[in-house]
């Protein structure tokens, strides 16, 4: 039997096949892994890669393109890389690194990529944001005029921090730098300020301790913890602050206020140095790469107070008439008090002031161990509440005169009455500035203590009784003059009427002798 080939039938069949053919083509540049050393991968053949682009490796692993050379690309791998080997394919993604942002992250602990590590389930984020963003321009910024109360007498009275400011916390190891930052976070409870705590290169146990303390004091619900612990790769430690900053910018650009702590930027600089040296970039001073200043300046310049037009534009008109701010408290660890080292001088020059913590003061039991002479706030004075500004000036002056006279008094045997009084006043004010950890004070409580010091109510109290006197006075004010404290905390105003009320209350308390 002979088969008859029907040309019409065959052409119809071919036509249907052609019509049903779906050509889903995806143009992606692919390259080959040439070498892999210490988390740094060299790739050949990625012609169209951008700087900072995400590169996809087998096993759902990603890297960050950092060196674009003539015939190869140097990238850092974000995460474990044991399963990657020479000859593997690497693909361009056409995307830059983004992290989840939004309210859903509050109360959670995430890694540098925004992935939850607290066992609390996945995060349903409202949006994602690139970790690298251009800082707000000069025109979109607004001057710092509202305070961020840390709850610490010595900071709020002498080195005040404003919303949108960058205030450096600098000191040797074990001087209470993290304690100051954690107290500041705890004090934001109920103020509406969202907090981001970025832990860089710390022990996982230390981060767990911080999270536990925040939880105990009810401060975790308004805080995001971004942790890149010491066990994680240098690449993740290097990008963690940028990820935290992107999360803070979400609130800033919606007309809200946020506070970010970088703990600490010394370790970020070390991680960046490690990555740069492995990428064979030329080393400079202290073996840091040439752009280590830019590493910190582009991060800290993103902390700012932005005007209402900027917020309105970014929210597409949903939020009107509200300014937003991102306040930064970067931490730098010094070696043997050397603030003239490379990284400390860099960050001091970028920030709007510094809180200098000293080992000698810490060991002498003066905690927080703030050196009032070296600590300064360049823009915070404009943001201080009226009452703290009025009362804090006297305290700063007392301490400055005390430091000067104390050095002189070591050599002088007979001191005149005025000098002796000044020394005694200084000792009492120094004692008054001591504060227990995790016990931040309200503006009203602070005003009472500062008023007592300024008006000479402490002059007849023994130096070793000052702390007892203060806690008894605060207890008395809370129970008998709670309304006055609330009024001062709410308004922050200072008038002759308030001064008279405070004077009468403290005089009345002193007659009881209950301390």
Curated annotation (Swiss-Prot):
Annotated positions binding ATP: 171-178
UniProt enzyme class: translocase
Function of the molecule: Produces ATP from ADP in the presence of a proton gradient across the membrane. The alpha chain is a regulatory subunit.
Residues at the site labelled Required for activity: 375
EC number: 7.1.2.2
One CC-aspect GO term: proton-transporting ATP synthase complex
Subcellular location: Cell inner membrane
Membrane topology: Peripheral membrane protein
Homology family: Belongs to the ATPase alpha/beta chains family.
Pfam families xref list: ATP-synt_ab (PF00006), ATP-synt_ab_C (PF00306), ATP-synt_ab_N (PF02874)
InterPro entries membership: ATP_synth_asu-like_sf, ATP_synth_asu_C, ATP_synth_asu_C_sf, ATP_synth_F1_a_nt-bd_dom, ATP_synth_F1_asu, ATPase_a/bsu_AS, ATPase_F1/V1/A1_a/bsu_N, ATPase_F1/V1/A1_a/bsu_N_sf
Keyword terms: ATP synthesis, ATP-binding, Cell inner membrane, Cell membrane, CF(1), Hydrogen ion transport, Ion transport, Membrane, Nucleotide-binding, Translocase, Transport
Reactions catalysed: ATP + H2O + 4 H(+)(in) = ADP + phosphate + 5 H(+)(out)
Single GO MF descriptor: ATP binding
SUPFAM superfamilies: C-terminal domain of alpha and beta subunits of F1 ATP synthase, N-terminal domain of alpha and beta subunits of F1 ATP synthase, P-loop containing nucleoside triphosphate hydrolases
Subunit structure of this chain's protein: F-type ATPases have 2 components, CF(1) - the catalytic core - and CF(0) - the membrane proton channel. CF(1) has five subunits: alpha(3), beta(3), gamma(1), delta(1), epsilon(1). CF(0) has three main subunits: a(1), b(2) and c(9-12). The alpha and beta chains form an alternating ring which encloses part of the gamma chain. CF(1) is attached to CF(0) by a central stalk formed by the gamma and epsilon chains, while a peripheral stalk is formed by the delta and b chains.
Protein species of origin: Nitrosococcus oceani (strain ATCC 19707 / BCRC 17464 / JCM 30415 / NCIMB 11848 / C-107)
Name the UniProt record assigns to this protein: ATP synthase subunit alpha
